[in-house]
Amino acid sequence: MGIIAIKVGKSKAAQEATVSHTASLAGNDSGANALFERLGISRVDTIETFLNSLMILHEGGPLFRNTISSMSCSGGEASLIADLADPLTLDFPEFTDIQINNLSSILGPLVHIANPLDYQTYIWHDQEKLTECFTEVLKCKNELSFLIMDFPRKDKCHDTAWEPAINAIISAKKSTGSRIAVLASLDENLSEDKAIRFLSEGIIPLTGLDSGLKSAVAALKIGESWRKSLAPKLLWKNWAEIESQIENEFESKKILKNIGVKVPQVEIVKSKEELLEKYKKFKGSVTLKGVGHAHKSEHSAIALDIRKIDDLTVALDNMQKSGAAPKGFIIEEFIQNGRIELLIGFVRDNAHGFLLTLGEGGVLSEIRNDTQNLVLPVSEEMIVNALKSLKISFALDLFFFIEAITSSPAVKSAPTDKAPKYIEPK
C-alpha cells in the first residue's frame, strides 16, 4: 500500500516544541526528507493531505504515472485546479480528437472541450448524458481522474439534484474501471455518508482542491519509489554525541586528495616571505584566501584570478590590515573558465545517518538554496537523479560531474558497522 508520514521540525519553533520521545525524532529536517525519499515514504505537511493520501492508497494503492483529468460544472473550478496543479508534478494530458468530437456531441457547441473539463450545467439533470460525459473522460485511462462536486448541507436544503451526477459517476466507474476521486472544494461539502457511499463503489472521496492534488503527488511518489532499483543498505549506527569542529580548507583538501578526489594545487603559508616563495611553484593565475573563516566572502578573505606578484602582495596586505586572515593564508591554483560551482557536502545526522548534499555552490548558494540531500551510501543512479532535479541542472555537464563525484570513495558503499574515516569527527 505504501507509507505516508507527517514529520514536525521544519521550523525552529517546531523543533523547540518537540519534547520527550518526539524530540528524538525531530532531528535534521533535510535528513528526514532524504531518509523518507530513500525508504519510499511520502511526506506531507497537513493532516488533511495525510488523510486524503491514505484514502487514495486505501482505494487502489499508489499512483505510477502523473497523468490526471478533472471534471467540474464550473469554469472557476476548472481554472483553479489547473492553477493548483501547475507547480506540482502532475500533468493534464489533452483529449484525443476522437474524445473531443464525442464530448462535443454530448455537451453541445457551447461547451469548450479541454482537460480540465468544465462540462457546465446544461446536462445537470440528465443522468444519461452525465454518464456518457463521465465515461468518455474516464476512457482516456489517466492515472487518476477527479470529479469536483460540492454537496449542500442536509439540514439546510435538499441534495436530490445531485443524484443524477452521483449515479452517473458510479456507472462510469463500473464501465471503465478507471480510478476516480470525487473531490469537494471544502471539508464540510462532503458528508460522511456520501464518502461511505462512494467508497462502497470504489470511488475515492477527497476534500480540498489543493490537498487533493497534493495527496495525488504523495501517492505518485510512493509509486515511483517502487520502480527504483534496490538501494544499498543504509550507513547508520547509534553514534555518540560529539561536538563538531571545522577543518581549515587546506587540511580538508588534503583529506579529499588522500581519498582520490582531484583538488587544485594548493599551499598554506604564515608570512609574506613564505607566500612569495610558494608563489614560484604556480604557473598560472592564483587565488589568495585567508585562513580562519568558514565563509570567506563575508570577511573579504578571498582574492581571485591574481596574475602578477604585485597584485598578490597588495591582496595579502589588504587582508592583513583588515584581519581577514587570522590563521595564515592559502594560495591556490585558480581554475579558469569555470562555468558553475557544485557544492558537495557531508553531514553526520545522528537521527538519519550520513547525508550527502549536492547543490549550487558559490557566494549565492545560501540565497538560492538549490540543493538535494541523499543518505549514504548512494548509487550512481541516485546521484544522477539528484543532479537532474537541481534548478541548475540545465547548466551542468552531467557526465563530468557524475564521473567526478561517483569516482570518489566518499559516495560508494561502505560497511554498515563503521563510518568512513574522512567524515568521522576527531
For every predicted segment, state its role:
Residues 5-93, 166-261:
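Peripheral docking tails and interdomain loops at the edges
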Residues 7-12, 72-77, 98-99, 123, ...:
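Glycine-rich beta-alpha junction loops
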Residues 341-368, 372:
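Gly/Pro-rich active-site capping loops and adjacent beta-alpha segments
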Residues 50, 70, 145-147, 212, ...:
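Buried hydrophobic positions in well-ordered alpha/beta secondary-structure cores of metabolic enzymes
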Residues 14-17, 64-144, 148-153, 157:
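Short glycine-cluster motifs
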Residues 4, 118, 144-148, 181, ...:
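Structural motif
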Residues 407-408, 413, 422:
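Low-acidity, Ser/Thr- and Arg-rich intrinsically disordered low-complexity segments
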Residues 48, 55-66, 74, 97, ...:
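Active-site nucleotide/adenylate-binding loops and adjacent lid/helix of ATP-dependent enzymes
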